[in-house]
Amino acid sequence: MIVKNEAHVIVTTLDNLAKYITFDYWVICDTGSTDGTQDIIRKYFASKEIPGEIVQHEWQDFGHNRTLSLRAGYNKSDYLLIFDADDSMHGNFTLPVKWTHDCYLLKFGSGMTYYRPQLINNRKKWMYVGVLHEYLKAEEPVNGECYLDGDYFIDSGKTGDRSKDPQKYQKDAQILKAAYYKEKEAGNDLANRYAFYCAQSFKDSNQVDDAIEWYTLVADTLPNWVQERYYSCVMLGQLYERKGNFEKSIYYFLKSSEFDSERIEGVVFACDRLRRANMHQLVMMLYHKYKNYNPDPKNKLFLFREPYEGLFEYSASISALNTKEKPLGFSCARKIILGTTNDNIKNAIFDVLRFYIHELLDDIDSLDMFYILTSIIHTSSNPALATIWNLLFKKHKNDLIKTPKPIKVKSTTVEVFLSFTSCKRLDLFEQTVNSIMNHFLDKEKIDYWFCVD
């Protein structure tokens, strides 16, 4: 870790890490703090009785100073965690059970994900390359890398000292622009990486025309890594949309597939815009071509999750109504309800389902859909959900209240007591009891059933 004036955030960051990892030693490099960051760090680890050291380095650039930080910590542990002072871990992160690789890449982000090498063999020598958006490079032979998947993510913070500067991204863009031309003149491939992150910084500073210029350079001209070219196309699609250029927006969204046929974000974003423009035939043509996509592509740069969580099927379910492909449209809607974890898309599909009532009632497997709707209806204010639920309830009522198989009566002390009231409606009483018997997963735990008439 390298720090400068992080007194306002460093304890929060260290507390967050301590929830997930037990450290044997720590090395943090300070590059000129004037707010007492160094003493806060020393006192924190002293209170935990964890040995370590603060190292002072003069600031030059990220690649240089991160390399100095690695050298300061070299060989003082078996493995080294690299972490920024304002980042935070979330979810259920666990360290590898067996350390089989020299480099482990950790997951960043939730809605948009990417991986970075953050956990490395500290008996090997490493360095960072680049003045900004630097990358890790081994200085000696290493035993491969491994992506650490799991139910966790690291949030890249925006509360550190550097993020306080409102001109941060503008300054970054100029640094990267100058670095690009310097490396280009020297004939170094590092220039291509600088071009991509120059585009990123122009985009983050809301300089749209400059961002388009540099993303276009990456997408159309430079021999960048295919992931950078893919993402550049998606960004160009979004930026041209902001400028009101529909044709170029769609062009670059679709061009993305030239660089990675496994990723579908560009195609799905194009379909979303085409659907809104009532170009339904094009939506369905694209859906037929790409519908057998991989729902969980790995090892991608800046992956948008929403296109893999039902957004593609949502567009197809609407466009299919206009292209007389209702069976396919209904299957898309059904797939969303049964499979997606995206609550926004799932809630939106209920309005679409109103146009598929005939298909819904004819669906022989709609009981599974009813159970899912039952589990979420109390969390939704969408009246369309209640309409669909009522239709499915009427359709499956006989299945829900059919006479169940008997259960064994236990002769034990009564611990679980279930009571009912009834009033001259034996038929309704039977339906209630039968529905409980059919759907309570732990009904065997009921010791005594009691009815007051």
Task: Identify the role of each PLM range.
Residues 1-15, 32, 244, 420-431:
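Active-site beta-to-alpha loop of glycosyltransferases that engages the nucleotide-sugar donor
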Residues 15-24, 28, 434-446:
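Short, acidic, metal-binding catalytic loop of nucleotide-sugar glycosyltransferases
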Residues 16, 29-41, 58-59, 451-453:
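A conserved acidic beta->alpha catalytic loop
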Residues 25, 414-419, 447:
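Cell-envelope/extracellular polymer assembly enzymes that use nucleotide-activated donors
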Residues 39-68, 72:
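Conserved donor nucleotide-binding strand/loop of the catalytic core
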Residues 63-70, 83, 87-213, 217, ...:
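Catalytic-site signature of metal-activated, phosphate-bearing donor transferases
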Residues 202, 240, 274, 319-320, ...:
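Residue at a conserved register position within TPR or TPR-like alpha-solenoid repeats
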